[in-house]
């Protein structure tokens, strides 16, 4: 067996469907398009969402909500993830990036209270929840709010 003699297993590949190449192929004459009608013509596709003149679903349903212009996109870290750091260490943006807990700072870093922290840490972030602060301070840690 050589690399230039490798072939896929029998039945692992299919021949492509060659349409409109004679009746013997099984896909001749109408070339799998049936008889007449819009879908049999060239360029005869119907645009997405078109319902034959009936008011389409995306126009029947009301618009909802809005996007706040000043919304901040925080990188989220849960306190359960902070156990990767050694006790007494300072956890800041650089440390979180190096540990792979966040992929970027975005509009800041926010710490949430999901999970449990067992080590005393000094956490320096842009935002945090009240529960997260409670849990960090309960094990002798400290949380500081920094500006971006």
Curated annotation (Swiss-Prot):
One Gene Ontology cellular component: cytosolic large ribosomal subunit
Organism: Geobacter metallireducens (strain ATCC 53774 / DSM 7210 / GS-15)
Full protein name: Large ribosomal subunit protein uL15
Keywords, ordered alphabetically: Ribonucleoprotein, Ribosomal protein, RNA-binding, rRNA-binding
Record's function text: Binds to the 23S rRNA.
InterPro entries xrefs: Ribosomal_uL15 (IPR030878), Ribosomal_uL15/eL18 (IPR021131), Ribosomal_uL15/eL18_sf (IPR036227), Ribosomal_uL15_bac-type (IPR005749)
Region (Disordered): 1-61
Pfam families: Ribosomal_L27A
GO BP field: translation
Subunit composition and interactions: Part of the 50S ribosomal subunit.
Keyword Transmembrane: no
Record field: compositional bias (Basic residues): 30-39
GO MF annotation terms: rRNA binding; structural constituent of ribosome
